[in-house]
């Protein structure tokens, strides 16, 4: 319930994503002026950047209802029909998270719903089967995905607006922490909020989670104000360093450097050495390490960068590191 109370309701309250918000203000004002539903919108980007929150904000700005579901929850056309025909009114928004995981059958039934606001359902089987056409209210579909490459071309082409959410700066994340603190009645210095922001991997969800944990440490210590020093102590206790690396992130780099001489080493081999699932390594840990300039993917395998050596306190290898 705390998260719901902290969720922004308007674009002005929504922190970050300034370029996207500027465009959304135009789209929303135009739709309201024409008294039409907003065009179907696809939001894509890494997890934790606020796609679901933005859908709630858009619904609030338009003064319409929001129905939230996910791709895996819509297994068959009947599930989709039940939502579209029974849960939505004129102008309402249907938000489908992980829309890339829609079944092919459900996705194909979504096409006419998006284009013409109708849906054909087959009743019965064999010679007795008949088709019933459902007239649907004019609605807006907001799809969200972390894997835009898995969105099929026919589905992608039916979105009138396609937008990418970017990682947040430490300063924007600090603003988010300060906002949550203010709403919760927690006193925190700007310096402490910035230290949390610097370790939040560019992700608002992580910043909010770290703020709650730092608040726990401060509360147990009996401190009325979260200072920079208290925040640093709490973040260190959580195993986070100044780049926001967790223990597992550092283990990946250390194994790469100490056991494989900095690489290159194949993903499967590295995963085996770490007793880790290759998919988890590739999708959860590597993106941030690459974005921080600590790891490179090359045709021959993973390579630790000079920055990785220096960050962990190891002397970098003599000569240039292997390049792709």
Swiss-Prot record:
DNA binds at residues 297, 302. It is found in: Cytoplasm. It holds the Pfam family RuvB_N. CDD domains: AAA. It catalyses: ATP + H2O = ADP + phosphate + H(+). ATP binds at residues 14-15, 48, 51-53, 97, 146, 168, 205. GO terms for molecular function: ATP binding; ATP hydrolysis activity; four-way junction DNA binding; four-way junction helicase activity. The activity of RuvB is enhanced by E.coli RuvA. SUPFAM superfamilies: P-loop containing nucleoside triphosphate hydrolases, Winged helix' DNA-binding domain. Residues 1-168 are annotated as: Large ATPase domain (RuvB-L). Keywords: ATP-binding, Cytoplasm, DNA damage, DNA recombination, DNA repair, DNA-binding, Hydrolase, Nucleotide-binding. Residues 242-324 are annotated as: Head domain (RuvB-H). Changing residue 309 to R: Suitable for crystallization. The keyword Oxidoreductase does not apply. Disulfide bonds: none annotated. It is an enzyme of class 3 (hydrolase). The keyword DNA-binding applies. SMART domains: AAA. Its main location: cytoplasm. InterPro entries: AAA+_ATPase, AAA_lid_4, DNA_helicase_Holl-junc_RuvB, P-loop_NTPase, RuvB-like_N, RuvB_C, WH-like_DNA-bd_sf, WH_DNA-bd_sf. Belongs to the RuvB family. HAMAP family: DNA_HJ_migration_RuvB. The RuvA-RuvB-RuvC complex processes Holliday junction (HJ) DNA during genetic recombination and DNA repair, while the RuvA-RuvB complex plays an important role in the rescue of blocked DNA replication forks via replication fork reversal (RFR). RuvA specifically binds to HJ cruciform DNA, conferring on it an open structure. The RuvB hexamer acts as an ATP-dependent pump, pulling dsDNA into and through the RuvAB complex. RuvB forms 2 homohexamers on either side of HJ DNA bound by 1 or 2 RuvA tetramers; 4 subunits per hexamer contact DNA at a time. Homohexamer. Forms a complex with RuvA. Electron microscopic images suggest 2 closely interacting RuvA tetramers sandwich the HJ DNA; each tetramer associates with an RuvB hexamer. Forms 2 complexes with Holliday junction (HJ) DNA which probably have 1 and 2 RuvA tetramers per complex (called complex I and complex II). Forms an RuvA(8)-RuvB(12)-Holliday junction (HJ) complex. HJ DNA is sandwiched between 2 RuvA tetramers; dsDNA enters through RuvA and exits via RuvB. An RuvB hexamer assembles on each DNA strand where it exits the tetramer. Has 3 domains, the large (RuvB-L, also called N) and small ATPase (RuvB-S, also called C) domains and the C-terminal head (RuvB-H, also called M) domain. The head domain binds DNA, while the ATPase domains jointly bind ATP, ADP or are empty depending on the state of the subunit in the translocation cycle. During a single DNA translocation step the structure of each domain remains the same, but their relative positions change. Domains M and C are flexible; they change conformations whenn bound to whole RuvA and only domain III of RuvA; domain C probably binds Holliday junction DNA. This is Holliday junction branch migration complex subunit RuvB. It comes from Thermus thermophilus (strain ATCC 27634 / DSM 579 / HB8). The lineage of its organism: Bacteria, Thermotogati, Deinococcota, Deinococci, Thermales.
């Amino acid at each position: 319930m705390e998260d719901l109370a902290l969720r922004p309701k308007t674009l002005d309250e929504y922190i970050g994503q300034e370029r996207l918000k500027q465009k959304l203000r135009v789209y929303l004002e135009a739709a309201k002026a024409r008294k039409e539903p907003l065009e179907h919108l696809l939001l894509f980007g890494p997890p934790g950047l606020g796609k679901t929150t933005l859908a709630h904000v858009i619904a609030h700005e338009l003064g319409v209802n929001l129905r939230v579901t996910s791709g895996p929850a819509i297994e068959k056309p009947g599930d989709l029909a039940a939502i579209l025909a029974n849960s939505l009114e004129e102008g309402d928004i249907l938000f489908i998270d992980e829309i890339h995981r829609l079944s092919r059958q459900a996705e194909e039934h979504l096409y006419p719903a998006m284009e013409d606001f109708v849906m054909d359902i087959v009743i019965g089987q064999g010679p007795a089967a008949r088709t019933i056409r459902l007239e649907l209210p004019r609605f807006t579909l907001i799809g969200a995905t972390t894997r835009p490459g898995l969105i099929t071309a026919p589905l992608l082409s039916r979105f009138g607006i396609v937008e990418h959410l970017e990682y947040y700066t430490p300063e924007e994340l600090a603003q988010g922490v300060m906002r949550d603190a203010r709403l919760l009645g927690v006193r925190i210095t700007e310096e402490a909020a910035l230290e949390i922001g610097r370790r939040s991997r560019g992700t608002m969800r992580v910043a909010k989670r770290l703020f709650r944990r730092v608040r726990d440490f401060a509360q147990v210590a009996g401190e009325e104000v979260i200072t920079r020093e208290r925040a640093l102590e709490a973040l260190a206790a959580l195993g986070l360093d100044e780049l926001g690396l967790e223990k597992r992130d550092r283990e990946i780099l250390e194994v790469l450097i100490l056991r494989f001489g900095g690489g290159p080493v194949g993903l499967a081999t590295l995963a085996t050495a770490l007793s880790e699932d290759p998919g988890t390594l590739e999708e959860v840990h590597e993106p941030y390490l690459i974005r921080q300039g600590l790891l490179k993917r090359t045709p021959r395998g993973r390579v630790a960068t000079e920055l990785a050596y220096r960050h962990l306190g190891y002397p970098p290898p003599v000569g240039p590191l292997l390049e792709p």
